[in-house]
Amino acid sequence: MLYDGSSRIGGLAHILLPSEGLSLDSDNRAKFPSTAIPMLIEEMRKRGAWGRPMAKIVGGASMFASLLPSGGINMGERNVEATKRVLRLAEIPLVASDTGGEHGRSVYFHVSDGRVVVKSLKMGERVL
């Protein structure tokens, strides 16, 4: 999630893969951090965002780890690292995160104040 507190404008992307090279169909720019983050910034600016955005990351779980061979690819972890790399390159501060583990999460993004509420059966509720 990106949020500009000055204008109270934000957006989020559901990152599915760390790079376009891992997809058979790379037409959906919102699936990859290298294209989703610039797209979010562009859309926020179109809607009047003028301040410096900040970021919060949620997700990156390895929900099916028990089905993977030991040492197998952890796509969630790779998505988180790729997202952090793109944020660093764009000089967008990462101010909070709730990532990893083996549990799913529900995310509620309150654009009015930038709060992100993360809920999971395993970990309960957390506000970022």
Task: For every predicted segment, state its role.
Residues 62-77:
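Phosphate/ribose-phosphate-bearing ligand recognition and processing surfaces
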Residues 47-48, 90:
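Residues at alpha-helix termini
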Residues 52-59:
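Short glycine-rich phosphate-binding loop at a beta-alpha junction
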Residues 23, 66-68, 107:
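Short, well-ordered secondary-structure micro-motifs
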Residues 16-21, 59-63, 100-101:
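Acidic, glycine-rich active-site loops and adjacent beta-strand->loop/helix elements
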